[in-house]
């Protein structure tokens, strides 16, 4: 049974404390702008040729931190250590890849290794599709991206059976548990979604799902929405997004999701699922070959879902845009489209997280497509536009889109969590929109942080 902890305890943090915290962040922004005005122009060019508005993303960071405190279900129960350490871990990862050459080169080496693995997919594709695979046909999504998802699904299935992935999951999960003060279940799940994604990761904590507190369940759901994991991560790179940045975003999502979730829904109950050792093993596969086969089939299901959603959503975008264009022409307005509407709605957010204003409408469109429709739709539009965007816009957009936080994912989580623990299905459905909001904020916080660090 789950019970409330410290029900009669006096709140440690009142509204005045929260107001002071937000005021300090805003004061930092003001002081930064004053310093900038006194010491130099509002932007500079980095060694990579990136012109960055100094600390523009601090607006987005302050906005997001203010939102999670304002909308927190139990402000008095917020553990500031979790917020502070989570933010520090995100900043640390961003510094490693953006400001430490050795760190970036190490990530680039991993990226190149993954690209080499991807190239082996061509052998299987050419055998199955033969002459359809040709450079003369150019980039064909169904033959270039979807087979990679299947291959990496098989590879991850094999590594999972051999317990290679579990070593990383145990290490990262234990580290997050000790450093951030989150429960073992939450921490392991946050590490697991780096590899397995939102639909497969709940299997890892299946024995504990029924025992999770409401806060723990919300945190796991947030981790799923914020994640950009496994085979789909490489799929984004094939659409044009830089793979090193995608890998960094995937890692940053782990502490980021814990930070956001534990601020929006702090723990007010005593966890009974926080075991000392949480065993993670493949119990469904009989042997390595069976595990690889199951992984391939799992990847195949994801590939089919991705293909179906892209066909449906891109067609719907065209239909709605055509309707808007026709409706606008009746009143003398030309060029109305769904993309333009997304751009208008999300442009202020894009600017707040560090995107230059001249690119804000375009990036806002990508964020809107990713959130309302699907992240693959967002990356499909983002890839061809990369040459026309400024380098910092490409960096920030890559991080902003790297997550499953979209409306269709709510149904996926209800199916995955609810299927494994039917007694929690109602809770999952109830928390769905709020957890989606938390996952979205996680992705935006990552994007704002890397924008600020790039400007240092």
Residue ranges and their predicted role:
Residues 95-128, 271-274, 320-345, 358-366:
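Interfacial/capping segments of alpha-helical transmembrane domains
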């Amino acid at each position: 049974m789950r019970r409330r902890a410290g029900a009669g305890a006096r709140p440690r943090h009142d509204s005045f404390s929260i107001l002071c915290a937000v005021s300090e962040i805003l004061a930092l922004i003001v002081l930064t702008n004053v310093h900038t005005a006194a010491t130099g122009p509002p932007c500079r060019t980095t060694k990579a040729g990136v012109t960055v508005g100094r600390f523009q993303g601090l607006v987005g960071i302050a906005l997001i931190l203010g939102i999670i405190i304002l909308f927190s279900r139990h402000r008095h129960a917020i553990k500031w250590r979790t917020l502070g350490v989570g933010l520090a871990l995100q900043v640390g990862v961003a510094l490693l890849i953006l400001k430490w050459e050795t760190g970036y080169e190490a990530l680039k080496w991993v990226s190149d290794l993954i690209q080499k693995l991807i190239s082996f997919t061509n052998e299987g594709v050419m055998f199955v599709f033969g002459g359809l695979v040709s450079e003369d046909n150019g980039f064909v999504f169904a033959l270039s991206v979807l087979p990679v998802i299947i291959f990496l699904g098989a590879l991850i299935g094999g590594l999972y059976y051999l317990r290679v992935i579990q070593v990383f999951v145990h290490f990262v999960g234990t580290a997050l548990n000790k450093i951030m003060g989150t429960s073992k279940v939450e921490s392991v799940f946050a590490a697991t979604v780096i590899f397995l994604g939102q639909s497969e990761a709940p299997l890892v904590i299946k024995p504990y799902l029924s025992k999770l507190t409401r806060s723990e369940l919300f945190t796991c759901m947030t981790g799923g929405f914020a994640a950009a994991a496994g085979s789909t991560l490489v799929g984004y790179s094939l659409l044009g997004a830089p793979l090193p940045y995608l890998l960094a975003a995937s890692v940053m999502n782990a502490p980021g999701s814990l930070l956001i979730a534990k601020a929006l829904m702090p723990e007010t109950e005593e966890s009974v699922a926080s075991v000392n050792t949480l065993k993670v093993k493949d119990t469904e596969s009989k042997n390595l070959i069976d595990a690889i086969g199951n992984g391939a089939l799992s990847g195949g299901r994801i590939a089919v879902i991705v293909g179906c959603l892209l066909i449906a959503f891109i067609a719907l975008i065209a239909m709605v845009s055509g309707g808007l264009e026709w409706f606008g022409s009746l009143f003398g307005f030309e060029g109305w489209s769904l993309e333009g509407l997304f751009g208008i709605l999300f442009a202020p957010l894009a600017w707040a997280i560090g995107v230059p204003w001249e690119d804000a409408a375009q990036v806002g469109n990508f964020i809107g497509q990713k959130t309302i429709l699907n992240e693959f739709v967002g990356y499909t539009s983002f890839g061809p536009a990369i040459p026309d965007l400024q380098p910092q816009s490409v960096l920030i957009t890559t991080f902003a889109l790297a997550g499953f936080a979209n409306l269709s994912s709510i149904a996926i989580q209800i199916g995955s969590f609810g299927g494994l623990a039917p007694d929690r299905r109602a809770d999952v459905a109830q928390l769905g929109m709020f957890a989606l909001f938390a996952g979205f904020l996680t992705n935006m916080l990552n994007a704002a942080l890397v924008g600020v660090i790039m400007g240092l």
